[in-house]
Amino acid sequence: MGGDDLSFTRLVITALFGLLMLLQIKETSASTSFVSSSVCKSDHLTYTKPYQQGSLFTINGNPVEKLRFCEALRFHKANGCIFEDSFSDDFCTIHSLLGRRFLEEKTVKDSKNSKPKTEYSHVKVSIAGSGFLLLCCALCCPCFHKERKANSHEVLPKESNSVHQVSSFEMSPSSEKIPQSPFRAPPSPSRVPQSPSRYAMSPRPSRLGPLNLTMSQINTATGNFADSHQIGEGGFGVVFKGVLDDGQVVAIKRAKKEHFENLRTEFKSEVDLLSKIGHRNLVKLLGYVDKGDERLIITEYVRNGTLRDHLDGARGTKLNFNQRLEIVIDVCHGLTYLHSYAERQIIHRDIKSSNILLTDSMRAKVADFGFARGGPTDSNQTHILTQVKGTVGYLDPEYMKTYHLTAKSDVYSFGILLVEILTGRRPVEAKRLPDERITVRWAFDKYNEGRVFELVDPNARERVDEKILRKMFSLAFQCAAPTKKERPDMEAVGKQLWAIRSSYLRRSME
C-alpha cells in the first residue's frame, strides 16, 4: 500500500472514530441524572441517579466499577452505617441492615459550584475528548514512537579509566511509582492490598540508570574518600556517600586494601549478581571499578539508614508495629525474587538487620551481595558445596555442619531477622542473663509459656492482638527450624505474611 493510501486510510478511521465519540457524547448529554452521595467513616460514596447502564460510581472521588462500589456498600452496611432512602442500592440487591449511625447526604460540588446533574456529562465529555486526541496521535504519528524507541537504547560513550556500567537493557530507567502500603492510610474496602503473586514478586527496575564516571569524578563526589563521607563498613570494605555533579547521590563501596586480593571473589560475585537483578526491594547496582589498586561498587543511595539503626532508635524515631510488618514483607518479597524469579537462583548468605536499608517512606531494600552465590543449576542438584560465610547469629546451623548451601539457609536467617524485628533484640546479646543471650531460644521458651506479650519490643508503641503476635512468632520459628526440611520456602512465607496482614487489617477496623 502506498503512502497516500495509508494516510487516507488513517484519516477515514480517525473521522469514523470521532463521529462515534460525538454521538456517544450527544446521547450522554441528552440523558438526565443527578449525583447521590454519602459519607461513611473514611469513605465518600457517590453515584449518578437514576441507575442505568453506564452510571458513574466513585469512592473518595476515584471512579470504580459497580462491583467494587457494591462491595463497599455491603462492607459499610455490615458495620452499622445507615443510608437515607434517597441513596438507593437496588442495583446491588443488598438487603438493608440495622445500624448505629445515620449518614447525611452531601451534595457533590465542583470548584465552580456547577449543578450536580451536569457533572457526569462533563466527565464523559472529557474522557471522550481525551480518547479522540490519543487515537489521532497513535494513528498519525508513528514516527514519534520510532524516535522514542531509538532514543531509549542510547548508551553514553565510555571514557578512559571510567567506571564500568551495566547494560542499558538490564538497567533501563523506569518511572514506576511504588504503591502505598495499606498501613499508611485508614484501611477501607476500596484499597484492598494486592495478592502476593502480583505484589513485588516480579522485577521492578529502579528509576536510576547506569552511570559512566571517571575516577576523578568519583574522587570529587566523595571528597577523596573523606571520613565525613563514610556511611558504613562491612566485610568487603568501607561505604561512602557520593554526590555527583548533577546532584545525584550514590553509595560507593571501596574494597579494603589489606584484603584486596582475598576479596577478589567477593567483588566479582557481587558485581555479576547485582547486574542481573532488578527489584524494588533490592539495592540497585549503577556501576563498578576494577582497575589498578581500586575496586569500587556503585549503587543507589538509600539515605534512611539500616534497619538496625531504627531498631536502636539511632535515627531519632522508633519503629511501630505497622512499620515492622511492612519491612518484614518487603524483605520477604526481595528474597522470594532472588530464590524463585531471578534469571538464576541467588542465595544471599548474609541476611541481617544491618544489611536491610530503609527509604524515607520506610520501604525496605536488601543490600550487600558480597557473600551471595548462585544456586544449583542442575535440577538434580540439591545444594552447593561451599565454604561457610555469613554473620554469627544468623548462620544456618545445618549449613555450618555440612557446608551444603541452599536457599533454605536464607530462610533460616530470615527467621532470626523476624525475631529481631519483633523483639528489638540482636540475635546474640552477650551482656544479658545466660538464658537470654541467644535471642531465638529465649523467645521460643517465652512463646511456649504463653508469655508472648513479654517478647514484643516496648518501642513498638502499639498493643497488637495476641493471635497476630503468635502467628508472627510461629512463622519465625518455622523459618529458624534446625534443618532445612522443616523450613518453608520464601514464597510460602510470603503467603503466610499476607494472611497475617489481612487479619491485622480486619482487627484494626473493629
Curated annotation (Swiss-Prot):
Predominant place of localization: cytoplasm
Keyword hit for Phosphoprotein: yes
Keyword Ion transport attributed: no
Record-listed Phosphoserine modification sites: S354
Positions annotated to bind ATP: I231, G232, E233, G234, G235, F236, G237, V238, V239, K253
Annotated stretches, region: Disordered: 166-209
CDD domains linked to this entry: STKc_IRAK
Keywords: ATP-binding, Cytoplasm, Kinase, Nucleotide-binding, Phosphoprotein, Serine/threonine-protein kinase, Signal, Transferase
Modified-residue entries (Phosphothreonine), positions: T214, T386, T391
Cleaved signal peptide residues: 1-30
Catalytically driven reaction(s): L-seryl-[protein] + ATP = O-phospho-L-seryl-[protein] + ADP + H(+); L-threonyl-[protein] + ATP = O-phospho-L-threonyl-[protein] + ADP + H(+)
SUPFAM superfamilies the record matches: Protein kinase-like (PK-like)
Domain of life (superkingdom): Eukaryota
Domain Protein kinase: 225-499
Enzyme class: transferase
Active site (record annotation): D350
GO MF annotation list: ATP binding; protein serine kinase activity; protein serine/threonine kinase activity
EC number: 2.7.11.1
GO annotation, cellular component aspect: cytoplasm
Family: Belongs to the protein kinase superfamily. Ser/Thr protein kinase family.
Name listed for the protein in its UniProt record: Calmodulin-binding receptor-like cytoplasmic kinase 3
Lineage, opening ranks: Eukaryota, Viridiplantae, Streptophyta, Embryophyta, Tracheophyta
Protein encoded by which gene: CRCK3
